[in-house]
């Protein structure tokens, strides 16, 4: 009974804390479907694979935990434009983040590395090609890495439609930071791809593992067939008149 009560208190405290951060930084009062469960899993130290539709709010699933972690959250992202958009959005709400990629001048690149060493950054975005370089591995070895997040994780799988060989090397980074929790996110993954992601990233090897698959049903998107009435010429004439107005 005591264990149950303590577990409930801790669980309730985590939910309260998450909602406080959600309101403080994003202005929302409640989470979208599955966001809360995925965040709870990550904060509980579970390796996690989450399949969520585009627009389902995947970013919050690692951004919220990053605010609680003592170390940095490294986010592997496939496109420079996505990194820039995310960092700009985070900066606008006061969450310290940056990216390291080929779009930066050398001076800015080295300054960003200095900020990471200082411990002032909560989220680092980089491409898999950048992450596996010796320079970045040496940089991350000087700080605490609390979470490794892989966005567009289907790129890991040779069975996926966007396979990128560099993504498979992320498993090497996992071995360098065994204490870091791993979160893999994607909007598209068959059962075969999910199994390949889990195997490649060694999800659940040293930590508990949880998998979440959200519904892809969009009630606001539908197909409808409307039978036409009247002649085509009449409709075209009406369109011409409306354009003339």
Regions found by a protein language model. Give the residues of each.
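Short, positively charged and aromatic/hydrophobic N-terminal segments
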Residues: 3, 7-15
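Walker A/P-loop
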Residues: 45-63, 76
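Conserved pre-motif I regulatory segment
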Residues: 17-51
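Conserved nucleic-acid-binding Ia/Ib motif block in the N-terminal RecA-like helicase ATPase lobe
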Residues: 74, 80-126, 211
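Conserved helix/coil segment N-terminal to the catalytic DExD/H
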Residues: 105-147, 157-161
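Post-DEXD/H (motif II) to motif III coupling segment of the RecA-like Helicase ATP-binding lobe
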Residues: 146, 154-213
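Conserved interdomain hinge at the start of the Helicase C-terminal
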Residues: 224-245
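Pre-Walker A (Motif I) flank of P-loop NTPase domains
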Residues: 44-50, 71-72, 121-122
């Amino acid at each position: 009974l005591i264990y149950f009560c303590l577990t409930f208190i801790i669980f309730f405290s985590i939910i309260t804390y998450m909602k406080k951060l959600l309101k403080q930084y994003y202005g929302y009062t409640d989470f979208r479907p599955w966001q809360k469960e995925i965040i709870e899993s990550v904060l509980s130290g579970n390796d996690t694979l989450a399949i969520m539709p585009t627009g389902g709010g995947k970013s919050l699933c690692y951004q919220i935990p990053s605010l609680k972690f003592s170390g940095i959250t490294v986010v592997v992202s496939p496109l420079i434009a996505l990194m820039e958009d995310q960092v700009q959005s985070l900066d606008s709400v006061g969450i310290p983040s940056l990216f390291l990629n080929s779009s930066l001048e050398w001076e800015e690149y080295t300054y960003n590395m200095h900020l990471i060493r200082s411990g002032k950054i909560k989220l680092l975005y980089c491409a898999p090609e950048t992450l596996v370089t010796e320079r970045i591995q040496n940089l991350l070895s000087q700080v605490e890495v609390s979470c490794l997040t892989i966005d567009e994780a289907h790129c890991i799988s040779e069975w996926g439609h966007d396979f990128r060989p560099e993504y498979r090397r992320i498993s090497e980074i996992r071995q360098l930071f065994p204490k870091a929790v791993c979160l893999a996110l994607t909007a598209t993954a068959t059962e075969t791809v999910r199994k390949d992601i889990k195997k490649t990233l060694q999800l659940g090897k040293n930590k508990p593992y949880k998998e979440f698959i959200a519904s892809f049903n969009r009630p606001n998107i539908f197909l409808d067939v409307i039978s036409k009435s009247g002649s085509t010429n009449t409709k075209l004439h009406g369109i011409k008149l409306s354009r003339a107005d």
